[in-house]
């Protein structure tokens, strides 16, 4: 996995918009435990413990042992409720409570695809769907097939506005060029850069703000799957209880403020699955 150079900036970003990240709490009737996959420093678990003390048993899972150490320190100092912390393997070995648990996968899937192998990605989906969780809550980034399509004038207008922004912010211009090269795009001439699809533009707009950990963020694939592909993964023993595909309001406002681009493309989704008994 790509190194996180500034854990403080990374975890600060993770803490923002907790109300949106805990969108599923009023929809998981009967669940007794919340298992947060990719718990990072435990901020979301702490938020739930503070907002709803002792309503749920709380468990955090992360593949990054450095993050688990941060979570342990953070939660021991700031949280009254006992919260268990595990790697996925440790959780699978000891847990017998998935049947009445809600698995939360917030901004996890794109990281699994960015850093995983085909084998580890398959293992991830097996863990998600075969552990018997009562609910599975997923919140991440994805575009739909229809949103990827955009005519050249829309792409050109967005590139022009990004170029204007980069002229005012040379560091951002450097990031944009690095992003394009990493995405296997290329210069047509000295003054113009070709982006192959509207997806490339949206992908950049999703990540340009993360300058501190840019080397890591640049290489992550925020959009590994279309929403249609996500929905096709739902197995027959789960039903879709809630689904929303939307544009993150803060992102839309920030892109308009920085670039003057009206980002109407849906970039994020929430999906709640309920096990069929």
Regions flagged by a language model, labelled:
Residues 112-128:
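A short, conserved alpha-helix within the catalytic core of class I
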Residues 104:
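A conserved beta-strand element that flanks and buttresses the S-adenosyl-L-methionine
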Residues 107-112, 140:
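Short catalytic micro-motifs in class I SAM-dependent methyltransferases
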Residues 85-86, 108, 122-125:
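A structural preference for long, well-packed, hydrophobic secondary-structure segments
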Residues 1-50, 55-95, 131-277:
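Class I (Rossmann-like) S-adenosyl-L-methionine-dependent methyltransferase catalytic domain
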């Amino acid at each position: 996995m790509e190194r996180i150079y500034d854990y403080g900036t990374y975890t600060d970003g993770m803490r923002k918009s907790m109300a949106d990240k805990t969108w599923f709490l009023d929809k998981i009737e009967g669940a007794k435990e919340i298992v947060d996959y990719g718990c990072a420093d435990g901020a979301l678990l702490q938020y739930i413990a503070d907002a709803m003390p002792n309503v749920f048993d709380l468990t955090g899972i992360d593949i990054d042992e450095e993050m688990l150490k941060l979570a342990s320190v953070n939660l021991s100092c700031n949280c009254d409720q006992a919260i268990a912390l595990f790697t996925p393997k440790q959780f699978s070995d000891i847990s017998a409570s998935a049947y009445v648990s809600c698995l939360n996968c917030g901004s996890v899937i794109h990281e699994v695809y960015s850093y995983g192998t085909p084998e580890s990605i398959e293992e991830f989906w097996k863990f998600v769907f075969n552990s018997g969780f009562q609910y599975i809550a997923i919140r991440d980034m994805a575009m739909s097939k229809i949103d990827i399509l955009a005519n050249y004038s829309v792409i050109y207008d967005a590139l022009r506005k990004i170029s204007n922004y980069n002229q005012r912010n040379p560091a951002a211009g450097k990031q944009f060029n690095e992003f394009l090269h990493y995405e296997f795009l290329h210069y047509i001439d000295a003054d113009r850069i070709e982006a192959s699809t509207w997806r490339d533009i949206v992908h950049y707009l999703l990540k340009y703000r993360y300058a501190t950990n840019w080397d890591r963020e640049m290489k992550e694939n925020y959009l590994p799957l279309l929403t249609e592909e996500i929905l096709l993964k739902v197995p027959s023993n789960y039903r879709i209880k809630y689904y929303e595909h939307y544009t993150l309001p803060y992102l839309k406002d920030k892109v308009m403020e920085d670039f003057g681009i009206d980002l109407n493309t849906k970039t994020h989704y929430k999906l709640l699955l309920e096990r069929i008994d």
